[in-house]
């Protein structure tokens, strides 16, 4: 038995609930807090909003939201223990807000209950003149970075926040980028000029002041050392800075600093058409390929009412699992390299090239093929695809057996990773951890099983779990996930349905050619659909999937236009990095290197 396969799965929750439990929470809130009132827009417990995804959405007044959130997490019979996402909307130019209370800015709390297998969204309406909210960092520590992001992007102040400062944009930035009156392109801004004085001032803003973060410079007559790890260091896996407070070689505390890789991915979604935004999704987790396309196109299809053919579902699953393997191979190789083993990364990258050979033959591209489409995929499977897939499936298992010997079975790797950087299931949920990093604690939660999408309920596969939530288990879980992805791909190969690779729907994009062959009007519709993109009906929809690094979700708002009114990207790596201080205190820098490698993140997934 390999070291990876010795992990004993264990279930944390027996009652996973069901979709029928989703609306129960609204009645529960009504019984607990009473019917709608009049003290704020929407009342204490105000309007129940209808959305395109049937996600229970309740408007709550600002002066009651802290109380309601506290109840849902700590006092409800089946609590919502994870703060899945926290974001905001600038509503000032939105036209279609039927059956919603007046709001100039809206704050959205997205909660997840594992006991119910259900989510709930709470919305709070704000006016231009009073953009203030109570912090919820006393309820969820994971809210810290989310609240900082909302202040950074929208200018909404969270009273009581321990350190409300910019997080994605630099300290010297003027304005709040996701407001509708903020420029969306560099051509809409003044030409950039970096004078010597400005350069020096910007550099000074990067100087670390421990007192601002509640850190002491000395203790018992001994000076602490403050060390910059990054933003240019090979072991931080991107442009990422961690300021370490050290007592000798021991880490006393750490301050992660992100934002160096921020590109405005959500803002771009407001100026790209629904179709032309697809390539931008590839660049979020840039190792995940088409996996990034999937939650986006699924959310658009919910808004548009598109049901794709079974063949499309299976093709999407197959290519998503190929990219899961490719991403995990990068993780596997770089993780062992971080720990001092230089050979495995070359073998694993060679096998990743074999994955890309298949991907390129099917999609026409390698790392970022942008192959999924609204209503389908870009083209049908090519001749000979089945032979290429079968050759890979026959080749890969033996390679994984070899990797078990040289990597996860290696005694040096075990010594460096077992018992290092561990956390419990409760801590993982508290901080918003999802994906393999959550399952490494022993919690068998996988969106493909718990909330099947794209036909995943038709596939047989296991959900690998760990026991201790440490660096070793995080690695071992991913190794086993590669084997499970091979099982899924094999089932796709053996059971690929016949049929079309696009839905026969007027909003499928690009539209079907046959729709042009009737009269001049259908030709015009086709031309507009190709050049400007589809007009998606007004509404809101969220879709989350089990991506390579955890749960990746897209929350989309359509205002009845060819572009999105709001694109919110919920990435797994953002909350994962926020945990670094918790799991690194008391360890050595070499342990932190192992922790960073085991988290499996890319900074584009964090900074967007």
From Swiss-Prot:
<dbReference type="GO" id="GO:0030964">
    <property type="term" value="C:NADH dehydrogenase complex"/>
</dbReference>
<dbReference type="GO" id="GO:0050136">
    <property type="term" value="F:NADH:ubiquinone reductase (non-electrogenic) activity"/>
</dbReference>
<keyword id="KW-0813">Transport</keyword>
<dbReference type="GO" id="GO:0048038">
    <property type="term" value="F:quinone binding"/>
</dbReference>
<keyword id="KW-1278">Translocase</keyword>
<dbReference type="InterPro" id="IPR029014">
    <property type="entry name" value="NiFe-Hase_large"/>
</dbReference>
<dbReference type="InterPro" id="IPR023062">
    <property type="entry name" value="NADH_DH_suCD"/>
</dbReference>
<dbReference type="GO" id="GO:0008137">
    <property type="term" value="F:NADH dehydrogenase (ubiquinone) activity"/>
</dbReference>
<dbReference type="InterPro" id="IPR020396">
    <property type="entry name" value="NADH_UbQ_OxRdtase_CS"/>
</dbReference>
<keyword id="KW-0520">NAD</keyword>
<feature type="region of interest" description="NADH dehydrogenase I subunit D">
    <location>
        <begin position="223"/>
        <end position="608"/>
    </location>
</feature>
<dbReference type="InterPro" id="IPR001135">
    <property type="entry name" value="NADH_Q_OxRdtase_suD"/>
</dbReference>
<dbReference type="InterPro" id="IPR022885">
    <property type="entry name" value="NDH1_su_D/H"/>
</dbReference>
<dbReference type="GO" id="GO:0005886">
    <property type="term" value="C:plasma membrane"/>
</dbReference>
<dbReference type="Pfam" id="PF00346">
    <property type="entry name" value="Complex1_49kDa"/>
</dbReference>
<keyword id="KW-1003">Cell membrane</keyword>
<keyword id="KW-0830">Ubiquinone</keyword>
<keyword id="KW-0874">Quinone</keyword>
<dbReference type="InterPro" id="IPR010218">
    <property type="entry name" value="NADH_DH_suC"/>
</dbReference>
<protein>
    <recommendedName>
        <fullName>NADH-quinone oxidoreductase subunit C/D</fullName>
        <ecNumber>7.1.1.-</ecNumber>
    </recommendedName>
</protein>
<dbReference type="GO" id="GO:0051287">
    <property type="term" value="F:NAD binding"/>
</dbReference>
<comment type="subunit">
    <text>NDH-1 is composed of 13 different subunits. Subunits NuoB, CD, E, F, and G constitute the peripheral sector of the complex.</text>
</comment>
<comment type="function">
    <text>NDH-1 shuttles electrons from NADH, via FMN and iron-sulfur (Fe-S) centers, to quinones in the respiratory chain. The immediate electron acceptor for the enzyme in this species is believed to be ubiquinone. Couples the redox reaction to proton translocation (for every two electrons transferred, four hydrogen ions are translocated across the cytoplasmic membrane), and thus conserves the redox energy in a proton gradient.</text>
</comment>
<comment type="similarity">
    <text>In the N-terminal section; belongs to the complex I 30 kDa subunit family.</text>
</comment>
<feature type="region of interest" description="NADH dehydrogenase I subunit C">
    <location>
        <begin position="1"/>
        <end position="199"/>
    </location>
</feature>
<keyword id="KW-0472">Membrane</keyword>
<dbReference type="InterPro" id="IPR001268">
    <property type="entry name" value="NADH_UbQ_OxRdtase_30kDa_su"/>
</dbReference>
<comment type="similarity">
    <text>In the C-terminal section; belongs to the complex I 49 kDa subunit family.</text>
</comment>
<keyword id="KW-0511">Multifunctional enzyme</keyword>
<dbReference type="InterPro" id="IPR014029">
    <property type="entry name" value="NADH_UbQ_OxRdtase_49kDa_CS"/>
</dbReference>
<dbReference type="Pfam" id="PF00329">
    <property type="entry name" value="Complex1_30kDa"/>
</dbReference>
<dbReference type="InterPro" id="IPR037232">
    <property type="entry name" value="NADH_quin_OxRdtase_su_C/D-like"/>
</dbReference>
<keyword id="KW-0997">Cell inner membrane</keyword>
């Amino acid at each position: 038995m390999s070291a990876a396969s010795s992990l004993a799965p264990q279930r944390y929750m027996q009652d996973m609930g069901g979709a029928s439990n989703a609306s129960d929470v609204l009645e529960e809130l009504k019984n607990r807090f009473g019917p709608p009132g009049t003290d704020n827009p929407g009342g204490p417990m105000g309007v129940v909003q209808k959305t395109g995804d049937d996600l229970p959405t309740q408007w709550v007044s600002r002066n009651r939201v802290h109380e309601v959130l506290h109840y849902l997490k700590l006092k409800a019979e089946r609590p919502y223990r994870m703060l899945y996402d926290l974001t905001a909307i600038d509503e000032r130019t939105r036209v279609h807000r039927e059956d919603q209370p007046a709001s100039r800015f809206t704050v959205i709390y997205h909660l997840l209950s594992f006991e119910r297998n259900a989510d709930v969204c709470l919305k709070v309406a704000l006016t231009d003149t009073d953009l203030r909210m109570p912090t919820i960092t006393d309820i969820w520590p994971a809210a810290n970075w989310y609240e900082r992001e909302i202040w950074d992007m929208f200018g909404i102040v969270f009273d009581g926040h321990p350190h409300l400062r910019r997080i994605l944009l630099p300290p010297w930035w003027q304005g709040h980028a996701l407001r509708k009156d903020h420029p969306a392109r560099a051509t809409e801004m003044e030409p950039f000029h970096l004078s010597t004085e400005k350069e020096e001032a910007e550099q000074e803003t990067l100087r670390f002041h421990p007192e601002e973060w509640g850190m002491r410079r000395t203790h018992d007559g001994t000076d602490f050392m403050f060390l910059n790890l990054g933003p240019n260091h090979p072991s931080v896996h991107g442009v990422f800075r961690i300021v370490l407070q050290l007592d000798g070689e021991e880490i006393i505390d750490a301050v992660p600093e992100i934002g160096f890789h921020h590109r405005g991915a959500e803002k771009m979604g407001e100026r790209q058409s629904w179709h032309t935004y697809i390539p931008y999704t590839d660049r979020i987790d840039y190792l995940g390929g088409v996996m990034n396309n999937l939650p986006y196109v699924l959310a658009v299809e919910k808004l548009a009412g598109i049901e794709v053919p079974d063949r499309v579902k299976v093709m999407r699953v197959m290519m998503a699992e190929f990219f899961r393997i490719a991403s995990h191979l990068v993780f596997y190789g770089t993780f062992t390299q971080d720990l001092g083993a230089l050979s495995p990364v070359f073998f694993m990258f060679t096998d990743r090239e074999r994955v890309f050979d298949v991907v390129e033959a099917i999609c026409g591209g390698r790392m970022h093929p942008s192959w999924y489409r609204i209503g389908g995929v870009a083209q049908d499977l090519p001749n000979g695809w089945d032979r290429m897939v079968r050759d890979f499936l026959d080749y890969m298992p033996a390679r994984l057996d070899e990797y078990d010997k040289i990597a996860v079975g290696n005694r040096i790797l075990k010594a460096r990773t077992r018992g290092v950087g561990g956390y419990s299931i409760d801590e993982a949920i508290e901080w918003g951890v999802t994906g393999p990093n959550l399952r490494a604690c022993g919690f068998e939660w996988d969106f493909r099983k718990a909330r099947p999408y794209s036909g995943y309920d038709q596939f047989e596969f296991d959900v690998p779990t760990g026991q201790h939530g440490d660096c070793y288990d995080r690695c071992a879980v991913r190794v086993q996930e590669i084997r499970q992805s091979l099982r899924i791909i094999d089932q796709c190969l053996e059971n690929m349905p016949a049929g079309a690779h696009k839905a026969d729907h007027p909003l499928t994009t690009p539209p079907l050619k046959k729709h042009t062959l009737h009269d001049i009007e259908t030709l015009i519709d086709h031309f507009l659909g190709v050049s400007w993109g589809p007009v998606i009906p007004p509404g809101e929809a969220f879709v989350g999937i089990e991506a390579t690094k955890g749960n990746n979700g897209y929350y989309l708002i359509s205002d009845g236009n060819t572009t999105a009114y709001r694109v919110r990207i919920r990435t797994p790596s953002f909350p994962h990095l926020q945990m670094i201080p918790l799991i690194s205190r008391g360890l050595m820098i070499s342990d932190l290197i192992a922790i960073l490698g085991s988290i499996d993140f890319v900074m584009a997934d964090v900074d967007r």
